Amino acid sequence: LQKMGVEMALITNKPERFVAPLLDEMKLGRFFRWIIGGDTMPQKKPDPAALFFVMKMAGVPASQALFVGDSRSDVQAAKAAGVACVALSYGYNHGRPIAEENPAMVIDDLRKLIPGCLDMDAEILLPDIKRPSPRESIVVVTRKLWMKVIKALARWRWRA
């Protein structure tokens, strides 16, 4: 994604002081242009302030952003910001099915995104999303997903 010009951000409700060192230790920090912790801004998810901030800094409209999350607050924040959300069926969601939040797509394994990442002809359908140009897109990732998403989303493709 980085080579394709897609900028990524990590947005979490965990304090930033814990997130950045962990990313650096795992040699993943360089993949994220923005790291927004729960104490970075006055508001935490599900407030969309962090998403609005990242989109403004990237110069990317909501129609060209994608949010990958694993909790109710992730889906709510994405919806409030007008951003499509791919939700994982596992993760921190207080035992409730994430599908109840009606994200654009629910997957139970990040590897399900791989066909769209590795094969330029493969398509992942996300309703109501406009196809962005590769340079004008951003992926926002939350919580512990960043490790898996970096590997899985090497070449993200989707269409409306």
From Swiss-Prot:
SUPFAM superfamilies: HAD-like. Mg(2+) binds at residue 70. GO terms for biological process: DNA repair; glycolate biosynthetic process. One of its GO terms (molecular function) is phosphoglycolate phosphatase activity. It catalyses: 2-phosphoglycolate + H2O = glycolate + phosphate. Transmembrane segments: none annotated. It is an enzyme of class 3 (hydrolase). Its cofactor is Mg(2+). Pfam families: HAD_2. Its EC number is 3.1.3.18. Specifically catalyzes the dephosphorylation of 2-phosphoglycolate. Is involved in the dissimilation of the intracellular 2-phosphoglycolate formed during the DNA repair of 3'-phosphoglycolate ends, a major class of DNA lesions induced by oxidative stress. Belongs to the HAD-like hydrolase superfamily. CbbY/CbbZ/Gph/YieH family. This is Probable phosphoglycolate phosphatase. The gene is gph.
